[in-house]
Amino acid sequence: MIDTTLPLTDIHRHLDGNIRPQTILELGRQYNISLPAHSLETLIPHVQVIANEPDLVSFLTKLDWGVKVLASLDACRRVAFENIEDAARHGLHYVELRFSPGYMAMAHQLPVAGVVEAVIDGVREGCRTFGVQAKLIGIMSRTFGEAACQQELEAFLAHRDQITALDLAGDELGFPGSLFLSHFNRARDAGWHITVHAGEAAGPESIWQAIRELGAERIGHGVKAIEDRALMDFLAEQQIGIESCLTSNIQTSTVAELAAHPLKTFLEHGIRASINTDDPGVQGVDIIHEYTVAAPAAGLSREQIRQAQINGLEMAFLSAEEKRALREKVAAK
């Protein structure tokens, strides 16, 4: 189902949601951190989704053990490097990794700006080693409030040339986008792209707000757009992309089953929607699974899956020249 003549991308992928269970074990031992289990087999139920979670907030708790072992900036650098290694192993040509440095820093009071620098270093080294192209998206974790998000924003701005876009993630219902208008104004002033998690836990009004008030060029998840025909028309007309994450939306109980996922409808409506993983380490999936198992189960035809793959590159925060070069590089192989 993957067209090997086209670039394979993953543009909605959380770096801090893709910490290997084996790495969690090893860092736990290295830093003498108490874990809920002491073998890979017994640890996995604590760090990966085994059964669907009742809601988004419950799902997010599965990420916590991964960041609890980030006891140093070297640990942050390691997981960033391993994220690129994982991307290469699964055949990705281009990946946009998003991360919340405040979340990664929290368990061991690491300097937030230091986490940003460590992630940049790890990703740069990974790209050099494995030949994958990557860009970084800074996440503000709305769940921690406006002041904490301000701290994250300042850390990103200190490395503004290495950050491509700003995102807002976390408890969408409890912390609406309206709380973060000034943050996004500064992001746009810095010349960054904007993508926002919206329409996952909250309704279509959250997507409208992300676009109109925060300046979103892309929407993360966006499943609730299906409830608003005018919104779907607007997304298609304005070419505002939806970063679809099929398995994730089932595991968070955002969508009841893959057959009910709106991605097929979005594509039929002319919306620029792509296929992505979200938190592959926590979900126990990879991009190949999303294309070859999840997408067909969501009712997508072979041509629709190919269109979603094309959309992934078209939606990417790359220049026209960078996209052309990537297409040519893959075609030459």
Swiss-Prot record:
Role according to the record: Catalyzes the hydrolytic deamination of adenosine and 2-deoxyadenosine.
Top-level enzyme category: hydrolase
Pfam family, one: A_deaminase
GO BP of this protein: adenosine catabolic process; hypoxanthine salvage; inosine biosynthetic process; nucleotide metabolic process; purine ribonucleoside monophosphate biosynthetic process
Catalytic machinery residues: E200
Gene Ontology annotations for the cellular component aspect, listed alphabetically: cytosol
Keyword field contains Hydrolase: yes
Swiss-Prot/TrEMBL catalytic activity: adenosine + H2O + H(+) = inosine + NH4(+); 2'-deoxyadenosine + H2O + H(+) = 2'-deoxyinosine + NH4(+)
UniProt family annotation: Belongs to the metallo-dependent hydrolases superfamily. Adenosine and AMP deaminases family. Adenosine deaminase subfamily.
Co-factor binding details: Binds 1 zinc ion per subunit.
Cofactor: Zn(2+)
Name of the protein in question: Adenosine deaminase
Annotated binding of substrate, by residue: H14, D16, G170, D279
Organism name: Shigella dysenteriae serotype 1 (strain Sd197)
GO molecular function: 2'-deoxyadenosine deaminase activity; adenosine deaminase activity; zinc ion binding
Lineage: Bacteria, Pseudomonadati, Pseudomonadota, Gammaproteobacteria, Enterobacterales
Keyword tags: Hydrolase, Metal-binding, Nucleotide metabolism, Zinc
Binding sites annotated in the UniProt record for Zn(2+): H12, H14, H197, D278
UniProt site (Important for catalytic activity): H221
CDD domains: ADA
Classification via Gene3D superfamilies: Metal-dependent hydrolases
NCBIfam families, per the entry: aden_deam (TIGR01430), PRK09358.1-1 (NF006846)
EC number: 3.5.4.4
